[in-house]
Amino acid sequence: MLGSSGRRLLTTVLQAQRWPFQPSRDMRLVQFQAPHLAGPHLGLESGNGGGVIDLNAFEPTLPKTMVEFLEQGEATLSVVRRALATQLPVLPRSEVTFLAPVTRPDKVVCVGMNYADHCREQNVPVPKEPIIFSKFASAIVGPYDNIILPPESQEVDWEVELAVVIGKRGKYIKATDAMAHVAGFTVAHDVSARDWQMGRNGKQWLLGKTFDTFCPLGPALVTKDSVADPHNLKICCRVNGELMQSSNTNQMVFKTEELITWVSQFVTLYPGDIILTGTPPGVGVFRKPPVFLKKGDEVQCEIEELGVIINKVV
């Protein structure tokens, strides 16, 4: 059961949503915990901002982690379709804790400078090839978890991103086949320590991107058939209620299919792998003067049809 602070956050979540979302029959997969459960369970979010249907209670043979669920492919998805067609008990949102929809993926792939308007913000040319870097999976936290400011950095910044979740293993994937390898989409916050990303560690991006808690995800993995067009979604970020980033995924330079084709030339993609597809303009480092996160700040990252994640900085 949530305490008063948790109830306040729930109210904030519901108030934060600015755009219309898909109806509750859409497939919005979550990982969650509840006081009466022995450990994490898989669930269905009953509409964006709604309660949770416990899929493991509906079908006890289902895996309890998203990666294992995705590895089983169509067999597990058919169970979820049956659950959607059945009147099932819904756990109130106030009684569950949302985890990241995917935890412990094989890899988290990230894409830099992948929004045309973000390139204009930096006064740099649009890349001719995707710029790829990574985060460690240990950076992943849930949609309402805290972001911990590391004492090693004084320049921690925000980046809202559309995240693609892989559902089918593949290597050398053709663009025409790429969407067949996608399970769905979720909201990501690519928290970034700019001093480490841009000035230290030989200007290699990894350390500045992968401090603990630097990859909030959620609230749900929305399956691809529940998203009208992933490349035409409003995307925004607010810090303490102030709009900092506002764009549309139609500004992406390299779309999902191109990114999957490119990345799969170098590495095998596995179910549960996550691809963060880049951020729009409005990040703190390019403001005049620059603005960075501080303790007590609250960051809301929101994408149309997918939902909103809210993380307090501590």
Swiss-Prot record:
Residues of the transit peptide: 1-84
Named cofactor requirement(s): Mg(2+); Mn(2+)
CC cofactor note: Requires a divalent metal cation for activity.
EC annotation from Swiss-Prot or TrEMBL: 5.3.2.2
Gene3D superfamilies for this protein: Fumarylacetoacetase-like, C-terminal domain
Binding site for Mg(2+): 159, 161, 190
Any matching Pfam family: FAA_hydrolase
Name of the protein described by the UniProt record: Oxaloacetate tautomerase FAHD2B, mitochondrial
Species, as recorded: Bos taurus (Bovine)
GO terms, biological process: oxaloacetate metabolic process
Described purpose of this protein according to its UniProt entry: Tautomerase that converts enol-oxaloacetate, a strong inhibitor of succinate dehydrogenase, to the physiological keto form of oxaloacetate. It is thereby required to maximize aerobic respiration efficiency by preventing succinate dehydrogenase inhibition.
Keyword Nucleotide-binding set for record: no
A single cellular component GO annotation: mitochondrion
Catalysed reaction, written as an equation: oxaloacetate = enol-oxaloacetate
Predominant cellular place of this UniProt entry's protein: mitochondrion
InterPro entries for this protein: FAH, Fumarylacetoacetase-like_C, Fumarylacetoacetase_C_sf
